[in-house]
Amino acid sequence: MLKYFGTDGVRGVANQGLTPEMAFKLGRDGGYVLTKNKKDGEQAKVLVSRDTRISGQMLEYALISGLLSVGIEVLEVGVITTPGLSYLVRAQGADAGVQISASHNPVEDNGIKFFGSDGLKLSDEMEEEIEKLIDAKGDNLPRPSAEGLGTVTDFHEGSAKYLQFIENTIPEDLDGIKVVIDGANGASSALISRLFADCGVDFTTIYTHPNGLNINDHCGATHTENLQKEVVKQGAQLGLAFDGDADRCIAVDENGNEVDGDHIMYVIGSYLAEHGRLKKDTIVTTVMSNLGFTKALEKEGLKNVRTQVGDRYVSEEMRAHGYNLGGEQSGHVIMSDYHNTGDGMLTGLHLMLVMKKTGKSLSELLKDFKDYPQGLVNVPVKDKKSWKEHQPILDVIAEVEKDMNGNGRVLVRPSGTQDLLRVMAEGPTQEETDAYVDRIVKVVEKEMGK
């Protein structure tokens, strides 16, 4: 198990867990690992960007210093979305990219996320190689001087290139649909108006005035309450909410109901399939997707492949088997015909495109999708990793699954950050689902509860 890297890079409380010293080490060691195979005489090129957090520049300057110290040329993009950076790495032929962001997390947190030359997140093996250098007793990496040092070049024009790329994926103006857009006071805030205006959208924005401290503050993809109210108040047909780095999109229908990533993928996937454009008639999701998603797809003659939690694993599955649509319930949606990572603004525009092409409201497009009631209990345990070694727990899960008779599912998994075992079930009614969860929780508490 990795020490510093989680499912989405290195994260922590800025200036405490994630310090400038750590950012320098990540720049130096990460930069070396990502560019060490360059031929002699070729200077490596790395793009660096950030979201709108007050700690972003502090960490950015430290990280860039680390990159420069191993002779890397840095293109400083400024504030841009994470998918924007991913696109620019590929478009500019860079060796790597680094985004400084903690996505949907609160302002006190920040993170450092690396991308390879393909614009994709790093493999576990590469992250492990970086961690070994961070923890090494000495520093034996190159220390060039004079002309061997790296330089920094301003590349703020990258934003315009990225917006043009997204606009080019939309074949016609998206007029006729009134939309309210929540920018989470994050990285998309300065981009939304430029992009959606160029796509002919009738829109208003909320939470697009970042001040360094208000990112994700009761707004964005994880707090849609105010967007839901605003959609109804304005009589809009749609609401779109992005998170701090805009790799997620959560929607709101014309009635003010939240529409998560499962529902967005169902709408886009069904439309693509109807037009023969959904590869292998399959959508890739994680184990967290609601059983109702799979059932709705089955009615359409479509399939659902599931991976472990994390959009990187969805992306890996899509590339390995040639699928072109996947994502997470949380709003990461990957449309690989256009982009190789989740992109909130791209997703929102393509959801609008389906609405315009079909002439249907979002609630109409979702009328055949019925979520299964879900029950979830977090059980404090002594050793979360050992739960599969307890036969009584495995037995009760098997018994519950047998009783469900294909009309429900169980998911038991350890928390990634706390000493908890998450026990989740879905079933035909809330009462039955809660009873299933309770049966399993009682055995877990008896076997390994604190």
From Swiss-Prot:
Its cofactor is Mg(2+). The active site is at 103 (phosphoserine intermediate). It holds the Pfam family PGM_PMM_I. One of its GO terms (molecular function) is phosphomannomutase activity. The modification Phosphoserine is found at residue 103. Transmembrane segments: none annotated. InterPro entries: A-D-PHexomutase_a/b/a-I, A-D-PHexomutase_a/b/a-I/II/III, A-D-PHexomutase_a/b/a-II, A-D-PHexomutase_a/b/a-III, A-D-PHexomutase_C, A-D-PHexomutase_C_sf, A-D-PHexomutase_CS, Alpha-D-phosphohexomutase_SF. Its EC number is 5.4.2.10. Activated by phosphorylation. Keywords: Isomerase, Magnesium, Metal-binding, Phosphoprotein. This is Phosphoglucosamine mutase. It comes from Lactobacillus helveticus (strain DPC 4571). The lineage of its organism: Bacteria, Bacillati, Bacillota, Bacilli, Lactobacillales. The gene is glmM.
